[in-house]
């Protein structure tokens, strides 16, 4: 099966009747879902792609295939736990059945404790510290996923990205039309930061430690006063901040509310030549 148009038609039709699917479903539907997940796993297709105009196009049918796999796959024993223990899940490890030759061909590092679920793509020269990459995600070349970082379902991580320790990149499977969380090329995401709900961090941006960005987070450019929602502009340097709250009924000052603050914007050359710590100093 090589025709993506035909594959998409089968997935779309099956999803319209997904309530009828179960672990006993065989034939064309199961074969198509498994084939689609294998293509995602190899990086031959991806849930979202950046267009020439900078906008991201979401392939909803691929998310549908991922969702249907939960109905089709039975729970089963997954080996590899500590002290010869097991897990109990529907989605196998990406590395299930891999041998030394498979890892050499894939050409990325996977440190003990790294968990990657089948259908997530890991590109060449990626480093996976003890971390978690969920199904349908895409991690591009020469990116570092540091210790205890999490890449959510269908998230798109660009080239030369550094996700620091404890970073959380949210997954977005539903609603189907929603964009996944996206970290574009050459971004640095500081320790314990969270980017969720389909937000986009544009190319070359730096998020300091402990920055939290969701769809309702106000992202304020300190120099211009401009407010962004759901997207950090390219080559922005962002730190945690707060906004004055509304007065309380008794007239006293209300509690401040969290926001993210763009403290500066840099061009590509400055970003390449300047250390992260220097960029975050003010």
From Swiss-Prot:
GO cellular component, alphabetical, reads: cytoplasm
Task: Give the subcellular location.
Answer: Cytoplasm
Molecular function (GO) terms for this protein are: 2,3,4,5-tetrahydropyridine-2,6-dicarboxylate N-succinyltransferase activity
Primary location = cytoplasm
Q: Which residues form a coiled coil?
A: none
State its Enzyme Commission number(s): 2.3.1.117
Report any one BP term from Gene Ontology: diaminopimelate biosynthetic process
Against Gene3D superfamilies, the record matches this protein to:
Hexapeptide repeat proteins, Tetrahydrodipicolinate-N-succinyltransferase, N-terminal domain
Q: What class of enzyme is it?
A: transferase
Which reaction is the catalytic activity of this chain? (S)-2,3,4,5-tetrahydrodipicolinate + succinyl-CoA + H2O = (S)-2-succinylamino-6-oxoheptanedioate + CoA
Q: Does the keyword Repeat apply?
A: yes
Q: InterPro entries annotated for this entry?
A: DapD_Trfase_Hexpep_rpt_fam (IPR005664), Hexapep (IPR001451), Hexapep_transf_CS (IPR018357), THP_succinylTrfase_dom1 (IPR023180), THP_succinylTrfase_N_sf (IPR037133), Trans_hexapeptide_repeat (IPR050179), Trimer_LpxA-like_sf (IPR011004)
Keywords assigned: Acyltransferase, Amino-acid biosynthesis, Cytoplasm, Diaminopimelate biosynthesis, Lysine biosynthesis, Repeat, Transferase
Q: In which pathway does it act?
A: Amino-acid biosynthesis; L-lysine biosynthesis via DAP pathway; LL-2,6-diaminopimelate from (S)-tetrahydrodipicolinate (succinylase route): step 1/3
Residues that, per the record, bind substrate:
109, 146
**Record carries keyword Cytoplasm:** yes
Q: How does it assemble?
A: Homotrimer.
Q: Which family does it belong to?
A: Belongs to the transferase hexapeptide repeat family.
What is this protein called in UniProt? Answer: 2,3,4,5-tetrahydropyridine-2,6-dicarboxylate N-succinyltransferase
Ranked from the top, the taxonomy reads: Bacteria, Pseudomonadati, Pseudomonadota, Alphaproteobacteria, Hyphomicrobiales
């Amino acid at each position: 099966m090589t025709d993506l148009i035909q594959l998409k038609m089968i997935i779309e039709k099956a999803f319209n009747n997904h309530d009828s699917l179960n672990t006993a479903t065989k034939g064309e539907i199961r074969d198509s879902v498994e084939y689609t997940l294998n293509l995602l796993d190899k990086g031959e297709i991806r849930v979202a792609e950046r267009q020439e105009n900078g906008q991201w196009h979401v392939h909803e049918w691929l998310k549908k295939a991922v969702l249907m796999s939960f109905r089709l796959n039975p729970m089963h024993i997954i080996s590899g736990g500590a002290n010869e223990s097991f897990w109990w899940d529907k989605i196998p490890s990406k590395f299930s059945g891999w041998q030394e030759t498979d890892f050499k061909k894939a050409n990325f590092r996977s440190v003990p404790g790294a968990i990657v679920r089948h259908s997530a793509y890991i590109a060449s020269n990626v480093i996976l510290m003890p971390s978690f990459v969920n199904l349908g995600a895409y991690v591009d070349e020469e990116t570092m996923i540091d210790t205890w970082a999490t890449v959510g379902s269908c998230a798109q991580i660009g080239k030369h990205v550094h996700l620091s320790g404890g970073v959380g990149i949210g997954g977005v499977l539903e609603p189907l039309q929603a964009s996944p969380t996206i970290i574009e090329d050459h971004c640095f995401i500081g320790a314990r930061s969270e980017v969720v709900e389909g937000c986009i961090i544009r190319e070359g941006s730096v998020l300091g430690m402990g920055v939290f960005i969701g769809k309702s987070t106000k992202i304020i450019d300190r120099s211009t006063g401009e407010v962004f929602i759901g997207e950090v502009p390219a080559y922005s340097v962002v730190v945690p901040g707060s906004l004055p709250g509304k007065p309380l009924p008794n007239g006293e000052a209300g509690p401040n509310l969290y926001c993210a603050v763009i403290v500066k914007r840099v061009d590509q050359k400055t970003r390449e030549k300047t250390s992260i710590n220097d960029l975050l100093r003010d």
